[in-house]
């Protein structure tokens, strides 16, 4: 029975899309990682709690098949902000979020990052390079 559970999870992982714009935050990538951890021995893995495993699979399968989207249809395909799906994907991409973090940094934090290298020895040389040399 563990072999059929493993195959069902593998099939679900194959069908679940991976969004490359959400590096490190994508549900599809996380799902693949968790299945690999849970079924380390592949089809020979012994499942400690088969009922919980089956419930988890059924929940993920409902999400993947858009069960709730069809059960609770929306009258319009807009959000409260009026943005489209593509605009949300752009805003929530990892690159855009990194840009927002950079924009929200204060001047002091930007200066610290610019002049403070990782090692303590490097701090002195970075400040020495940043200070103007006296004219002789």
Curated annotation (Swiss-Prot):
A Pfam family it matches = UQCC2_CBP6
Q: Name one GO cellular component term.
A: mitochondrion
Provide the transit peptide span: 1-13
Q: Where is this region: Disordered?
A: 114-136
Q: Which GO terms describe its biological process?
A: mitochondrial respiratory chain complex III assembly; positive regulation of mitochondrial translation; regulation of insulin secretion; regulation of oxidative phosphorylation; regulation of skeletal muscle cell differentiation
Q: Which InterPro entries does the record associate with it?
A: UQCC2
Q: Which residues form a coiled coil?
A: none
Tell me which UniProt keywords the record has, alphabetically: Membrane, Mitochondrion, Mitochondrion inner membrane, Mitochondrion nucleoid, Transit peptide
Localization in the cell: Mitochondrion matrix, Mitochondrion nucleoid; Mitochondrion; Mitochondrion intermembrane space; Mitochondrion matrix
Is the keyword Mitochondrion in the record? Answer: yes
Description of how the protein assembles with itself and partners? Interacts with UQCC1. Forms a complex, named COMB/coordinator of mitochondrial CYTB biogenesis, composed of UQCC1, UQCC2, UQCC4, UQCC5 and UQCC6; stabilizes nascent cytochrome b/MT-CYB and promotes its membrane insertion. Forms a complex, named COMB/coordinator of mitochondrial CYTB biogenesis, composed of UQCC1, UQCC2, UQCC4, UQCC5 and UQCC6; stabilizes nascent cytochrome b/MT-CYB and promotes its membrane insertion. Forms a complex, named COMA, composed of UQCC1, UQCC2 and UQCC4; activates MT-CYB translation.
Q: What does this protein do?
A: Required for the assembly of the ubiquinol-cytochrome c reductase complex (mitochondrial respiratory chain complex III or cytochrome b-c1 complex). Plays a role in the modulation of respiratory chain activities such as oxygen consumption and ATP production and via its modulation of the respiratory chain activity can regulate skeletal muscle differentiation and insulin secretion by pancreatic beta-cells. Involved in cytochrome b translation and/or stability.
PANTHER family cross-referenced by the UniProt entry:
UBIQUINOL-CYTOCHROME-C REDUCTASE COMPLEX ASSEMBLY FACTOR 2 (PTHR34260:SF1)
Q: What is this protein called?
A: Ubiquinol-cytochrome c reductase complex assembly factor 2
Q: Which organism is it from?
A: Bos taurus (Bovine)
User: Gene behind this chain?
Assistant: UQCC2
